[in-house]
Amino acid sequence: TEIGAKCRKMKIEKGLDLVIIDYLQLMSSGMSGVNRQQEVSDISRTLKVMANDLGIPVIALSQLNRSVEKRDVKEPVLSDLRESGSIEQDADMVIFLYREGYYNEDCEEPNKTKIKFDKHRNGEVGSEFLSWLGEYTKFANWSGMRE
């Protein structure tokens, strides 16, 4: 693939320790005659192979299905990954961010953000919390107190 060739060249010429894709659904595999779900599956597998071949982590940001917006409980789950179950299958880790304050400004802790490790092939799953600092567009350590 084009991205694989560019990454290999960069690793050889300058070094490459990490690749971040922002975001997966904007990529094209160049495959014709296939549906979008098949294309995203191919892209996901290609990124997994590239990560293994180059020996580096590849982080791919992905959209969620719109069905999340229609549910009462908005916290994402693995089946919410958009356009492909292969993203979940190929990934070594799947991490979601969830902030109740995004959906409900009247919640008790609108800046409390959950980092949810939903899949970790070589470790434990679980959650941690950060504080969203919207005016700076960044996260900070969660103080455990209301903000």
Segments and roles (model prediction):
Residues 23:
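Walker B catalytic acidic pair
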